[in-house]
Amino acid sequence: MHSRHIILIVAAIAVIALASCHNEKKSEKRSDTSNTTATTTDTTTLTKKKAGTTEPPKQIEADGIDKYFTVAPVSDSLWGIMQNNNIVNRKDLRHIRVLHWDFDNKSHQGEMICHRSIADTLVQIFKELYKAKYPIQRMVLPHLYGNDDEAQMQDNNTSCYCPRTVKGTTVMSKHARGLAVDLNPLYNPYYRAKKDGSLDVQPSTATPFFDREKEFDYKIDHNDLAYKLFTSHGFRWGGDWKTCKDYQHFER
C-alpha cells in the first residue's frame, strides 16, 4: 500500500509539471503575438489620420506599404462636409488615401476624392510615384480651401474631385465629376493667350513657371514620370492641348 501511494504521488507531480510546461508555452506564444502586433498599425488607425501627417519610413516598412494605399466609400461625415454643388452621386465617388513625398523628402499621408471608375488606377499610379520618391508637396481635400481652385493651386495642392465650373464659364469641370487630377499646380499652371494679347495664367502666382522652355524643379513634361504613368493608364494631359495649356491636368 505504501508503494502504491508513492506511485500515485509521483504520477500527480508529473501531471502538474506537464500542465505547468504547457501553460508556459502558451504564455510564450501570447507574448510573441503581443510583441508582433505592437510593431504594426491597424488600417482603421491609418484612415483616421489627417492628410499631411508625417509617416516615419521605419513605421511604413513595419506596417507594409499596401496599408497606406486604400480605396473606400465616402463616409457620412465626409459627405456632410462635401455637399456643395455636387453633380455626382455619392455612390459613384471614392475616398482614396496614399503616401507621398514632400519637397523636403518627408513621407506624408495624402487623400483625395475621385470617381469610382478611376479609384484603383489612381492608387496604383500614386504608389508607383511614391516608390520612385516623386515629389508632391501637398495632397488634401479641396473643401479645406472652400473649393476655391485658385487658392488651392497657389498652395500647390494636388487634388481630384472639386465641385466647380470651368473658370469663366457655366460648364462643370471634369473635376466636378472626379475624373481629373491636378498635380503640383503651382509649378505646372494653366495658361492661354487672350484676344488682347495678354496671358491668363492660373494660378496667378505661377507666371514664373508657364514658360516651359525654362528648367526648374517639379516641372511636368513628356519625360516626367507622372506624365508617363498617367498617360499609360489612359489619361489625357492638358499640356498637349492646342488652344490652351494646362500642365497640371490629367483627365479621363
Spans of model-derived segments:
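Bacterial N-terminal signal peptides that target proteins for export
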Residues: M1-L8
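Gram-negative bacterial Sec-dependent N-terminal signal peptides
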Residues: V10-A12
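C-terminal motif of bacterial Sec signal peptides marking the signal peptidase cleavage site
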Residues: A17-S20
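Bacterial signal peptide processing site
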Residues: H22-E24
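N-terminal module-boundary/linker segments of secreted carbohydrate-active enzymes
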Residues: R30, D42-K106
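Active-site acidic/histidine clusters and adjacent loop/turn architecture
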Residues: V88-M153
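Active-site-adjacent substructure of cysteine-protease-like catalytic cores
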Residues: D149-A176
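Catalytic cores and adjacent binding grooves of peptidoglycan-active enzymes
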Residues: V166-M172, G178-R252
